[in-house]
Amino acid sequence: MRTRPRRARLFLLCLLAWLAAPPASAQGPASCTPSGKNLYVRDRMTDIYFWYREIPNLDPVRFDSPEAYLDAIRYRPLDSTYSYITDRASNAAFFSESQFIGIGLSTSIASDQMRVLQVFPDSPAEEAGLARGDSIIEINGRSVPDLIATGAIDGAFGPAEVGVQVSIVFRNQAGGRTTVNVTKRLVTIPTVSLTRVYDVAGRKIGYIFFRNFVQPSVAALDTAFNELVAAGVTELVLDLRYNGGGLISVAQHLGSLIGGMQTEGQPLAEYFHNDRNAFRNRTIRFESKPNALRLERLVVITTRSSASASELIINALRPFMPVLIVGDRTYGKPVGQYQYDFCDKTLAPVSFTLRNARGEGDFFDGFAPDCAAADDIAHPLGDTLESSLREALTLIHTGACSAPAPLAPRSRVEPGRRAAGWQSLVNAY
């Protein structure tokens, strides 16, 4: 979740998954030299960072870059990737336009395999014939097992620059092997990829596959909810399985569309900052939306990639309606960032935590599923035979899981691979 102060180019970023606007008192660096940037990061971190008391006393001038300095001072027990520094232009493109430079696919890595989870429309990957469920065998002449074993898989597709060419060998689900060459360009991620209505035993059940909480999401969600209201939907399955979070303002909009009249004006979340910034603490509330649904409960599909603003939706609605989780445990990110633009970069330090109307919010272990289900990549998203959606529809129809969910672990479990910065929300190449 993100927010940002006005001085840092008020950009509405309420995300990481909870982004918000940076405090108005933030000033830019004295210079854009390496030492100037590092000193700027020190000044911001020692003021707004949620765990500022844990920052070690290291000389920022000794570090080669602000990224290296930030990595050295972050509070690693809880902040291994959340606070970040990134390129200012690409950060803005993602949050304002839902765009990034790449080939347009997201993947999962298990053991020595890379599988395709999603291919974005009108992307180089789609044009090359890649699809959900395909196995990527080689990237630029190197086998995927070798790339994984040597820790080189993250950079295997090359830099995020327009014109970079990538050679990919993949095998489709029928067993056919194909070699393609794709060229990176600007790719747009649809924030709402699917809106469906299923008729199950006389019930109208709505389904929304929601990919990220960015500015274009507001219009896309309004369109989706208008369709569901017109169809007379009385139940909703919200698919957040690959949604790593985004803007808090978008989470507020979505929560209000789901909560409807029963949550209107109620507390959605309360901000808590460190003691130096307690004056910034405030409460945001559910709003009135003419296209809101009238729901008695919400069913959410999640995986370990569901984080931040996705988890905020679950936590914020639970005081007012049952929120049932199908799939896997969520990531566990109950903290948010303000974003500060400086020179050609953006700094997003963990700055606050959010709690719901019952004061609940420390979900660093994530939320456990009520009904366990696999992310079934053998079937398309939105297909009623896909395991997670099938389980969600079963839960709505019968009131029970098809099989018991596993017991929640008693101690923090580290989730799977997660990139730093806005790239963790894209989770794509």
Residue ranges and their predicted role:
Residues A21-P23:
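N-terminal signal peptide c-region/cleavage motif recognized by signal peptidases
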Residues I137-V233, F286-E287:
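C-terminal, low-ordered peptide segments at domain boundaries
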Residues P190-T191, G244-V300, G336-Y340:
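Gly/Ser/Thr-rich loop/hinge elements
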Residues M1-L12:
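Bacterial N-terminal signal peptides that target proteins for export
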Residues S31-L117, Q165, R171-L194, P415-L425:
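Extended, small/polar residue-biased N-terminal targeting/export presequences
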Residues V41, L105, A125, G133-I136, ...:
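Terminal peptide-recognition signature
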Residues S388, I396-Y429:
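C-terminal functional modules
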Residues S96-E138, R142-D146, Y207, V214-V218:
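PDZ/PDZ-like domain segments forming the peptide/carboxylate-binding groove
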